[in-house]
Amino acid sequence: MNFTNFDFDQLFAMGDDTNPLMMAIWIIPIILFVFYGQRIQLYITSGEIKKGIKKLDSFKEESRNELIDYIKKNLNPKDDPVKKIDRFLDYFTIMPVDMDPNGIVDKVRHTVRSREDYTREHVKSLSPETSNLELTKVQTLLEIASSLQMFYKIVNHMFLTAKKQNNYPLILPLQMLLPFIMEHAEAMKEAIPALKAGQPIGDGIGSMVVGKMMLDRQKETVAFQTVLAKTEFENRKLFLLKAEGPSSTVGRPADALETIVSNDKLDAIIMIDAALKMEGEDSASIAQGFGAAIGGIGVERFQIEAIATTNNIPIFSIVVKQSVKEAITLMTKEIADQADDVRLQVYEMIRENTKQGQSVLIIGVGNTAGVTQ
């Protein structure tokens, strides 16, 4: 057979629309995509999602193993902690009914704090002599391991459900959300070494700024795991508030504010916190704003806003922008270097918005792991 004289025009009948081979080449793919298009797309997408699920599974197991190893090495439990830890990892929280929104915040606060108290007491039961520093580390590591396990379970459930029903539209939302889920999961996994070592994370920049201002000042505990110091600046009284470091905790600034307001008159509140940057924004950039700069599910912010409204206290905020990964992993040099600049901006904000003789509360918001005062 002479392949040098092969005539493609004759084979595909480029000039003849009635050629059967040419018609088959066009019609067969159309039929396949009409009747099996979703299934083909499902198979293609499934490969990408399977890789993500495999990663989530490895993150889940790695965080669990690191938590158990840390407890065995640092808490010296009397009994094997594996069964109790596995039970903790499967714990869930049912949020209160919100059909009637009246009083929902108090219910959520009660539910969340009850869970926190329960976890703290049961972790402490592993080793009653455990220091508060080690206790907060284990609590944070437990939350990370529990969150990674929940990520894995939800993604795996959605994937298996779509695959079982051959339902491509059901898998589309998962395909779109998976990159964001993986970004959070990878950040949590990379946060474990810093938290185990008791090193500062990006979210602690607010605590770091206020912690430096507290140095050589007398401190007092005004709320659970929350400390207060008093100082003066240009004939203005400053109240400095942050979570009690170097424990891995965010404290309870709203309860502390309630205590302070009951004893002293405040003329302004300045809150310093980390904030998620938008794509295209520079990491470690500083921005000023108005309103309560504090994350979480909203309980603390609601309480702070309510107290400020009742007492007619304006709330100013300064945030240091960073990515999700930077916020929960070891604090970068770029973010840490902004602490002094933020402090100078705080002083400038005090000059611009208060008069001599007035009082200002400065709250360093965020996880204070590795940050003293």
What are the functions of these language-model segments?
Residues 2-3, 22-25, 221-232, 344:
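…; additionally, a secondary subgroup of soluble metalloenzymes is captured
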Residues 44-208:
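Electropositive, gly/pro-rich neighborhoods at or near active sites that engage anionic ligands
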